[in-house]
Structures are given as C-alpha cells and as structure tokens.
Design a protein with these regions (language model features):
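N-terminal Sec-pathway targeting helices
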Residues: 2-16
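Juxtamembrane cytosolic interface motif at the C-terminal end of transmembrane helices
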Residues: 7-9, 20-30
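All-alpha RGS (Regulator of G-protein Signaling) helical domain and cognate RGS-like helical scaffolds
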Residues: 25-248
C-alpha cells in the first residue's frame, strides 16, 4: 500500500513538472514570434514607395495649387495684354504729346492690373511683391498726371501734325513689335517667374514709347514724364532680369 502511494506521489510530481515545462515552452515560443521591427506588418511595396517618392499628401496638394495658380495667372495676364493692345489704338489728335499720353494711360492701367493679379494669385518672392505694390502706387499717380496733361494741352489748342505723323509712325512700329508678347511664350515655373517675365516685357514697351516721344514733343511736362518713366522702368527691368537669372 505504501508502495502504491509512492507511485501516485511520483506520478503527480512528474505531471506537475510536465505542466510547468509546457508553460515555459509556450511562453518562449510566443516571445520568438513577437515582431521586433516597428514597421512589421507593412508591405515592402508600401515602405519602398514612401522612401522613393519622398512626398506627402500635403506636399502633393501644395504642388497642385501652385500649378493651378500659375495657369490662372497666365490666362489672366494674356487677357490683360489683349485688352491693353486694343485700348492702345490711338486716333490722331493733331498733337504727338496727347497721342503719347492717350496710349500710355491704358498701358499703365494694364501694369496695375498685372500687379494686382500677381498679388491675388499668391506670389511668394518678397522683392517682387514689393515691386508690384510700387508699380500700383507709382503708375496710379502717373495716370492722374497724364489725364491732367491731356486736359491742359487740349485747352492750349497746340497742334503739330508733322511731328504727330513722325511719332505715330514710330508708335505703330513699336506696337507691331510687341503685338504678340506673352501669348503662349511663357517658360515660367511659378507665379513669381511669370510676373517678372511678363512685366519685364511690359516695361520695355513703356520705355520704347517714352523714348519715341522725346523726339516729337515740345511739352516740358511730357518730356519730364517720359524721362521719369524711362529711368524708373529701366531700373526695374534690371531688377526683374536679375531675379529671373537667380531662379534659373
């Protein structure tokens, strides 16, 4: 009987040992199967795709917005230029100075519109943003000045059809040379470059007009205005040209 109890005791002890061994074995197996890589569970394609593109949804959206802004700005700029060229058709008045002023007013108005459009579509270059604001302020003042000069010259009754003929010949040649500027020619990658590229050509047109009138006007105020336009806009042409070179 004692021997039988010993057998039962030994059997129970062996059973307990076996159970303990099974528990340790199960725990060890679970530890070995636990993923150590924080990226475990993600496919190779997902990981490599993220590393390769280096883009995020937010950056992709920003790029799309920039592209939309550029497209919209260029479309608006082309329309501004088309309207300007139509408005700059000058009917002879008998005075070259008046003809010059009547052509330069819509030219200035389009420069203001281009600057407002640039600011609206989110230009980021601080130097160009300040230039756009300066153009709006300066050329708004010059438009007021030109309207006053047209009134004063008209009241004086001064006519010189020979000089007017010479000026209009130069004016028509200048208009022909600038007739297709902007349309489908932009190589800009963003709104900043598009504005600088377009305004540079626009300024050159104003400089050409102003240089032309100097040969055909006897009006001191018109001469001063033309010289002011030449000096200011040639300086801004150099400024925009430098900005475009830095962007290359």
């Amino acid at each position: 009987m004692n021997k039988q109890k010993q057998y039962w005791t030994v059997g129970i002890i062996l059973g307990i040992i076996l159970i303990v061994l099974i528990i340790f074995w199960v725990r060890a197996a679970n530890r070995n199967n636990t993923p150590q890589d924080p990226h475990a569970g993600h496919s190779i394609e997902e990981t490599s795709a993220g590393q390769t593109t280096g883009t995020t949804p937010s950056s992709s959206a920003a790029g799309a917005q920039d592209s939309d802004a550029l497209t919209s700005y260029l479309k608006e700029q082309d329309q501004i230029m088309t309207d300007m060229m139509d408005a700059m058709t000058v009917e002879p008045t008998g005075n070259a100075s008046v003809d010059f002023l009547k052509g330069m007013i819509p030219h200035h108005e389009s420069a203001i519109d281009m600057s407002l459009s640039y600011l609206k579509y989110g230009g980021e270059n601080e130097e160009l943003k300040q230039l756009a604001k300066d153009i709006i302020e300066a050329q708004t003042g010059e438009i007021d000045q030109m309207n006053q000069l047209i009134k004063e010259i008209g009241e004086s009754g001064v006519k010189d059809e020979a000089k007017e003929e010479g000026y209009l010949a130069a004016y028509d040649e200048m208009m022909s040379s600038h007739a297709h500027m902007h349309h489908g020619t932009s190589t800009a990658k963003n709104v900043d470059e598009a504005f600088a590229e377009g305004m540079l050509m626009h300024h050159q047109m104003a400089v050409d007009m102003s240089k032309a009138i100097l040969d055909y006007t006897d009006d001191e105020e018109v001469t001063k205005l033309a010289e002011t336009i030449i000096a200011a806009q040639e300086k801004e042409i150099k400024q925009m040209d430098e900005i475009l070179k830095q962007a290359k």
